[in-house]
């Protein structure tokens, strides 16, 4: 029953954003619900014929794709067990059909996401206000200082970091960079490479 939505998304050439809602279940509260449901959603999408039927469909998933990058090996094994022989059918390749925001709070998590799906599938995201606004007692910094984490990825060059921080979003959402520059206050940088890279709070 989602097909009419997919058809319209492709017709308009716009991006769908998957972000779970909260939970009323004590066993699966808030953040855990986000991760579990986003993981389940990705699994269902990539094991369906949605991208066969809508090859131009663009979907971005919040929170780095839930648990998917971390558990990729299990899902990879599952596709092989079910008969996947063409490399394009492997779950690791299917993962690259989606886009993922960088709302992750550790260096290891950000780096795993990039290694799993590639630079071109990572879109800078921040969560302020949100869970990540909390200040870590050990570092004294907000957990959601994601731009710093991206800039600290040692295996990426400057251009690749800028791709994640702003250039990928410009391409995906077809943003008018010149108009954005003109709209910026005079006391800000023309193209930010730090925490302002995606324009503020939310994903």
Regions found by a protein language model. Name each.
Residues 26-46, 54, 58, 63-203:
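H/E-rich (His + Asp/Glu) clusters that bind or coordinate divalent metals
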Residues 1-29:
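Extended, charged catalytic domains and RNA/DNA-binding interfaces, predominantly
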């Amino acid at each position: 029953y989602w097909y009419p939505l997919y058809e319209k998304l492709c017709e308009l050439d716009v991006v769908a954003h998957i972000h779970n809602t909260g939970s009323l279940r004590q066993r699966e509260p808030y953040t855990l619900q986000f991760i579990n449901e986003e993981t389940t959603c990705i699994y269902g999408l990539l094991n369906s014929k949605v991208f066969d039927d809508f090859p131009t469909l663009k979907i971005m998933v919040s929170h780095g794709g839930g648990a998917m990058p971390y558990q990729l090996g299990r899902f990879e094994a599952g596709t092989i067990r079910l008969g996947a022989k063409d490399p394009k059918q492997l779950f690791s390749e299917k993962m690259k059909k989606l886009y993922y925001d960088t709302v992750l709070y550790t260096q290891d998590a950000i780096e795993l996401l990039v290694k799993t799906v590639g630079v071109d599938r990572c879109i800078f995201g921040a969560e302020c206000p949100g869970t990540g606004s909390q200040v870590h007692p050990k570092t004294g910094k907000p957990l959601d200082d994601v731009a710093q984490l991206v800039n600290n990825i040692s295996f990426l060059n400057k251009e690749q970091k800028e791709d994640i921080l702003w250039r990928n979003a410009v391409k995906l959402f077809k943003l008018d960079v010149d108009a954005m520059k003109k709209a910026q206050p005079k006391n800000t940088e023309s193209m930010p490479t730090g925490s302002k890279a995606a324009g503020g709070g939310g994903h």
